[in-house]
């Protein structure tokens, strides 16, 4: 997810206001950008991993460890057939130029990248829900674009009804082993119809378990319900983007979406064990809603996030070195326990587990983080 960055940029640059605290999600800020990470090799399978450590910019005694994960980039002949349902909000609140008009031009970029055998359906919702384009092959681009051009804004927003119909249509046209996905585009103002968060989340989760995933695109300004959109996309094993101008739309539809729409691994989890001989204290920066208990790492029944083709994940840890460094946590030494540490140049051991998109058992890769990842001159990215 990268919505937080573009949403904050809009608040600062257009509205000239400071964003509220909850709008600043660190992991979405750092994952907005692309980095030069190691690509997967034959031994690593679907993921390449990069490590770099430098001095903390806010406390020179502490260190920042960056973990960069690079997903496999699927070639065109490896990408599965896609079954997309565009679920488009055409309520009155979408009439602004940076909402429905921008949405229509943005979706045309996705349509132009469709493969001939892909399927596209379009469901719209406002006061009523309707199917404006029955399942259509990707080779019929003019027909799909014509349906988009005819969309007009008006009425209130029955978002819950629209989601139900979109999922039903996706299931009716399910491609076994394919990429089945609802792409919801809205300003987030679900104010009429079935709007219970719990009911919507249960609905989305039930279809996720049938391998129908959800991507959400937020358009425009003002009444965009960012927290609700985030929860819904998380429940749908999906991702979401915030689009506020044509430049951002081009970036999302030609870079962000093209990779994340094709899942290469599901239930992706990482776990890192720090060497007490090297690290006295540590903290994960961001990802408050993504953290798992230690025992969940090897539990294949525990749900986690998916990773798409070419997708990158960036994780930062702040570290207090064992040989010194500032700490506000003043605690007494243990009286009855003595921790014996293994002296080595290891900083940590990194583990990553994932399942194949159609698999039930996890694969695991292990990497050792050595002290030579320290770079006194932090890299420019």
Regions found by a protein language model. Name each.
Residues 1-11, 16-23, 37-52, 57-65, ...:
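An acidic, Ser/Thr-enriched
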Residues 27-37:
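Short, structured protein-protein interaction patches enriched in aromatics and acidic/basic residues
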Residues 43, 47-268, 288, 295, ...:
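Exposed acidic/Ser/Thr-rich ligand/metal-binding surfaces
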Residues 25, 158, 196, 378-381:
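Secondary-structure junction/capping motif
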């Amino acid at each position: 997810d990268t919505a937080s960055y573009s949403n904050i940029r809009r608040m600062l640059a257009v509205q000239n206001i400071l964003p509220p605290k909850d709008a600043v999600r660190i992991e979405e800020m750092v994952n907005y950008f692309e980095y030069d990470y190691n690509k997967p090799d034959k031994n690593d399978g679907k993921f390449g991993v990069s490590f770099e450590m430098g001095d903390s910019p806010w406390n020179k005694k502490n260190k920042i460890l960056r973990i960069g994960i690079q997903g496999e980039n699927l070639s065109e002949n490896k990408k599965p057939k896609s079954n997309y349902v565009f679920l488009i909000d055409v309520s009155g609140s979408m009439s602004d130029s940076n909402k429905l008009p921008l949405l229509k031009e943005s979706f045309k970029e996705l349509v132009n990248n469709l493969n001939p055998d892909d399927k596209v359906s379009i469901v719209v919702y406002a006061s009523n829900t309707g199917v404006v384009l029955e399942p259509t092959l990707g080779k019929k681009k003019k027909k799909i674009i014509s349906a988009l051009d005819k969309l007009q804004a008006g009425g209130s927003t029955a978002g819950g009804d629209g989601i139900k119909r979109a999922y039903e249509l996706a299931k009716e046209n399910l491609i076994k082993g394919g990429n089945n996905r609802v792409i919801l585009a809205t300003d987030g103002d679900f104010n009429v119809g079935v709007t219970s968060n719990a009911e919507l989340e249960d609905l989305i989760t039930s279809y996720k378990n049938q391998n129908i995933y959800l991507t959400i695109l937020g358009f425009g300004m003002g009444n965009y319900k960012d927290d609700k959109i985030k929860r819904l996309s998380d429940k749908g094993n999906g991702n979401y983007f915030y689009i506020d101008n044509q430049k951002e739309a081009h970036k999302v539809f030609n870079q962000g979406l093209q990779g994340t729409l094709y899942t290469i691994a599901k239930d992706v989890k990482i776990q890192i064990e720090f060497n007490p001989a090297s690290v006295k204290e540590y903290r994960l920066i961001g990802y408050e809603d993504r953290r798992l208990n230690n025992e969940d790492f090897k539990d294949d029944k525990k749900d986690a996030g998916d990773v798409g083709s070419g997708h990158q994940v960036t994780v930062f840890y702040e570290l207090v070195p064992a040989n010194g460094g500032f700490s506000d946590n003043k605690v007494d030494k243990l009286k009855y326990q003595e921790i014996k540490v293994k002296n080595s140049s290891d900083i940590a051991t990194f583990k990553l587990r994932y399942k194949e998109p159609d698999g039930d058992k996890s694969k695991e890769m292990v990497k050792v983080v050595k002290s030579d990842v320290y770079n006194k001159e932090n890299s420019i990215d």
